[in-house]
């Protein structure tokens, strides 16, 4: 039987004689309609398939015929004969009708089976639902039973816990009562006769039960002391009942505790000698019951070799100060302290390991140890190197002075601060090691500002004495210097030195560094910095002011020489030497003062730069401190400015005096009124002009170098104005003809060219007006009225110059000008 169709018997050529049988199993699984259809029709179409096979390649097969391999008809068909084109159509129709009928029957069978299954499923579902409902009811009942059971268990547990608590409390009370009985028994033993410790229980003499004995003794003493305290309070209230107290017990307990403590300390020391850390730890633990173990801690620290060995202290001194009798330097002391403090830190670190292994409270022991190190060992070496000097009679500078003490103090403070940090890292418990370190220097820091200012004053005085000694030595070695050259010995030897001012600043900067080190609070730091900087301002102000005054003295000496020249000029023989001396003195003093001014400016710039770089930032955090220091700096330097101003005025007087001398001595009356002898006019400036310009160029070279900015402009402007007035006054002494007027114009050109280097517009303008006025000597008399038509402001000066014309009277210029310029008549 093939897939999809089962034949009941052999099949004939007539397809209607044999019905089809379809099985429901054919429709299960991977059902294929094409396969079912092919199995139905393959037996009815054999001739058609053969014709298709014989028709040759290229036509192909009827779609679906080759694939109809499933199913077959019952019986074999007869060979096809020549008949109609598709004779199997009737057979196929009959086949399809039978197939449809059987398919309908199969569907009815399937529907019947489905209805039966649905009924069975419904019945089973009802049974399951009923079963689940019953199960849920059972579970709910079970949960209720569990809840009741849990409540019962909790109740029983609470009852058991209460019973346990009662039992524990009863046991504790029993234990307490037992201990109390024992304590009362022991207390009665101690409350026997005073000082009698021979009848005590074996517990108090058994070395193996020392810890227990110590604990009981402490409890008994506490109880006895409290009882005595209560009796004392009752007696004070008037409710005391006469009776014997526990005073004897307290005394005996105290004696016993002292004896036991000493015994434990002895055992602790013996174990310490053997480095038996286990026994040491046991003793320390027992001793902790006596005053929290303070005696054991202090005893351990006090017995350290670095505190009891005299050689350790001597070694410390040699390490820091060197050999006996040598003068220690701060650098050597710094190295020595670093080495010593490193050794101390290493020793403390080793002790820390032992303390941690031995004591139950190592932090407390470390606090005691570090405190002892700072207060004994460090303080001992600090006392050796920091001998506070007296401000009334300070040590001389040759022996280091106050500066040596301050440097030692700074070095010691820095190294001790580093030691404190190292000890803090090792461990020092609750000890405030930084605060303790500060307390070691409190007496020094309290008076530090006074010592710092006194040191700066001492350094300044020593420097001034050194400069005076050098000046005197040079003066004595040089012998008597003649005054003919006009040199001032004191001025030349004591000129302002920028190097000296730099030393002042260097001292102050070092002091500020120490001040920053010792002053932790901003307000304190600002106050100390301000005071120290004020010392620098005073020193620089006094030094440069005195230097300027010495330079002014040189100018005054030159002025005195000029006075002697004026007095002696009537004597022809003495006039020349006096004039040379006055000129040399004036020029030398001028240059010396300009050098002083230049160095003064450089010194002030150094101070101002130092203030901006180092001082300002330390004062800004405190309101008003920076402004106050700026005002003090301005006030201090104003004294030097006043001295410089007076000296510059004297310089101008000196220059003008020499210019006046040169003009008076070198200017000839014939320079501006040459005779008409047929000789060509001289186109050169006059000799007096050449000498004056050469002198001014030479002497003012130092002024151009020394002065700058507004100071330079003001000085040269004043000098130019004074020169213009002097020339006006000088030229009014002469009579001018046209040739002399041309000579004057050449002089004026020289002067104008020189004063242009001043960079002073007002001076240039005045000299240009002089050039215009000088034209009155050149033009013809008839041209004079039109000469100043555009410049009415200079007519008055022009009239004075017109009067100097050689032809002023002969040409009756006065009458002509009075009619033209009536306001000038």
From Swiss-Prot:
It is found in: Cytoplasm, Cytosol; Secreted, Extracellular exosome. Expressed in seedlings, roots, leaves and flowers. Pfam families: Sec10_HB (PF07393), Sec10_N (PF20667). One of its GO terms (biological process) is exocytosis. Residues 244-266 form a coiled coil. InterPro entries: Sec10-like, Sec10_HB, Sec10_N. Disruption phenotype: No visible phenotype, due to the redundancy with SEC10b. GO terms for cellular component: cytosol; extracellular exosome. Keywords: Coiled coil, Cytoplasm, Exocytosis, Secreted, Transport. Component of the exocyst complex involved in the docking of exocytic vesicles with fusion sites on the plasma membrane during regulated or polarized secretion. Involved in polarized cell growth and organ morphogenesis. During cytokinesis, involved in cell plate initiation, cell plate maturation and formation of new primary cell wall. Belongs to the SEC10 family. This is Exocyst complex component SEC10a. The lineage of its organism: Eukaryota, Viridiplantae, Streptophyta, Embryophyta, Tracheophyta.
